[in-house]
């Protein structure tokens, strides 16, 4: 009698546990996969976000290039002034006209004696003490369409981050009166500038006052050394 009484609850407990397990399996549902429409919606949202962020990304890139150009321009002017301090004259003869091809100035300031491209410093003729006043890097790709942020070994010019050679202007008359390449009081200072050397970048559009760009500085994307 005692054995039967003890055994009955055990059998009932086992049956109850088995029933609970079976019931849990019956209520388990398989995971539903994404439908094609849902995937298309997600892709569309991602495309919209990229479209919104891309202009901001490009703006950040452009600003970084402008900042680099500004630093390069200041270094160019400082190098020209350092040359004047060392030699008592400027590195190249000029009549205050913009130097569109800056290779002559750069050869001299870099103490490069290369006999090429009409280098005025060939055989160290100008920078006789062979002092390196500026030492920018060479361009990573030396092709006409890809020159950026450095000196081209081919033509000797110093290119801005936008792929255009830097413009330089030197007070060749030694009268401390530099004609401003931009219209007076349009954001780039007064008419004549009381300064010995200036430099500027034509900016992203590649246009400066001397090659079809606007002379109103406020309406341009140019970068200048003196402001």
Please name every model-derived segment.
Residues 1-34:
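N-terminal leader/signal peptides at the extreme start of proteins
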Residues 66, 70-227:
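N-terminal pilin/flagellin-like segments and related low-complexity appendage regions
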Residues 30-60, 65, 69:
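N-terminal single-pass transmembrane signal-anchor helix
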Residues 14, 19-22, 58, 95, ...:
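Residue-level recognition of conserved structural "scaffold" positions that shape functional pockets
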Residues 9-10, 18, 41, 52, ...:
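N-terminal regions of proteins, emphasizing targeting and processing segments when present
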């Amino acid at each position: 009698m005692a054995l039967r009484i003890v055994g009955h609850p055990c059998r009932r407990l086992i049956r109850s546990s088995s029933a609970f397990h079976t019931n849990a399996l019956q209520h388990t549902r398989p995971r539903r996969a994404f439908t094609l429409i849902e995937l298309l919606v997600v892709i569309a949202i991602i495309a919209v976000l990229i479209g919104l962020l891309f202009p901001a990304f490009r703006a950040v890139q452009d600003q970084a290039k402008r900042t680099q150009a500004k630093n390069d321009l200041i270094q160019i002017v400082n190098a020209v002034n350092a040359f004047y301090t060392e030699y008592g004259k400027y590195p190249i003869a000029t009549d205050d006209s913009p130097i569109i091809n800056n290779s002559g100035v750069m050869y001299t300031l870099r103490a490069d004696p290369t006999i090429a491209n009409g280098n005025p410093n060939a055989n160290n003729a100008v920078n006789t003490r062979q002092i390196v006043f500026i030492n920018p890097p060479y361009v990573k790709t030396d092709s006409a369409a890809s020159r950026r942020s450095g000196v081209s070994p081919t033509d000797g010019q110093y290119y801005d981050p936008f792929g255009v050679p830097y413009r330089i202007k030197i007070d060749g008359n030694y009268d401390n009166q530099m004609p401003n390449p931009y219209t007076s009081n349009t954001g780039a200072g007064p008419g004549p500038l009381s300064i010995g050397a200036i430099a500027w970048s034509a900016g992203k559009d590649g246009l400066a006052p001397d090659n079809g760009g606007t002379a109103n500085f406020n309406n341009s994307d140019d970068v200048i050394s003196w402001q």
